């Protein structure tokens, strides 16, 4: 089953002229909509069709990659794996120097950096499949830097993730994301 859930990025992460506190409060509401309403509905629908609870994998490209990673890293109790393609995993690009409790809570680079090495989530992460991928071609520079930063944090915390940097011909574009999904999905589904 595939569920595609729209974001409110034009009001939140992409609304760089808006009040930062208001923007992140809206995003936090969206986050809770996903984990408090959508996830239980997915389990309900999957249970009706399959008579059992199904694993859930957040997946996204570009800004969706950040959302997928954030959902997974904040709630590994709800998600079994994550596929994030060409994402930014920190708040710098959208919020600049602004930081408060909610921005911190929604910036994987920040909250994973601050996570103690004996935090129970680290064991949970290591029991799941994590793939972060970025190209090194056109429009990927900021994303490549952010992916490098989060890779450093994941490595330092002992979090086993497949962080993959594709070639210099791999652009920030749908054609490449289709190829990456085709490449990674068998691994995530246990077919490889």
What are these regions (language model features)?
Residues 1-192:
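Non-catalytic cap/lid and distal C-terminal segments of serine-dependent acyl enzymes
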